[in-house]
Each structure stands twice: as structure tokens, then as C-alpha cells.
């Protein structure tokens, strides 16, 4: 299945996010040093990862480090980078490894996964695992349109990228007691009722509305 994501988010929607949310997001990223002084390949400490499991960190499309950067000759990362950021968030939630956002974006452009005016082709997810999996400790674990498969994969420790209406998000966990899924949205907007720090949502939200899921793409951990 090839899904050309219509992920060119409305610029007005993106710019309407309030300054407080952006400030909180930037503050949350500062683990020890700024990104500009760190190598592109780093791993968070176990204590930080445990903390992020309870309050997951989300890399956003409008981070000033890449928001205005052109993405493939049309549009920018802030409006069209959801497929890239969903991949980064899925890997980070999986094992604490940060993939360089623009390295992945440039790879998508180079290999023609960037579709100007439409977003990012879903082939990037398997390709990213093949290209960067060994470096960042993850592997491709298939794709499905089934909620039951999603639940099974999450219980086994996978994370998922989800194609919803005109957008990609990530799902990093499933709570058996509440029967809810932990969703990470790199461009949280009122129309999706998502937030900066992840949202536990019921299956009903994955079956209808702005988060109606069309397909799931899975990553599993592998040896570095």
C-alpha cells in the first residue's frame, strides 16, 4: 500500500498555537545541553527515559531549529514534516534514540518520498528502518490496517506511526487497564484535540473523526 500523505497542514492552524505551548516545548527539550552542542546521535539516560514514559516528550514540526526549513522544494518542515517527525517520535519513544530530523528529511527528498503539495509517501517508514535502523537501534516490523494488530504490536513493545486524516502521528503505548492508546502528535491542533505532551485516547477516536486511522506502520527495537 502506498499512501501519499496529504500532510500539508494549514499555516494558520500551525501559527495559531499559543506562545506558552511553544515555550513549554522548548523548555522540555533541554535535557542537559542544547541540541546545537550535541552530536546528532545521542541516547537519553535511563532515568530520563522512565520520566518520558510517564510524560512523553514530543518533537514538533514547529520547533524553531527546523520549522522554517524548506522540505523538498515546496512547503517547509513546519507545514509538511509530519511524516518525518512521526518517525523521529516513534523511534525516540521506542528506545530513547534521537534521529536527526533534517538528515531524515533530506533522505526522504533524495529518495523521492517527499511529494510536494501532498506530504510524505508512506514508503519512507520502511526505508528509514533499512537506512538508519542499525545506527539508531530499531527495525521495521510490518504494517497493518487492523486495530487488533496495533494492540498486539504495542503489547509486544513496538511503537507505531499512524496515518490519520491528512496527517501522520505516532502511538507509543497501550494501557490494558484503561484500554487507551498513548498518541503523540507533532502538530497538535484543536481539530484533533491533541496536546504537547501526549494523549491517552480510546479506540473510538481511532475509528472516527480527525484521528480516524487508515494504516499503522510498526517499529521494533534492535541491537545497536
Predicted features, each with a name:
Residues 7, 92-224:
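Conserved active-site-adjacent core of cysteine acyl-enzyme catalytic domains
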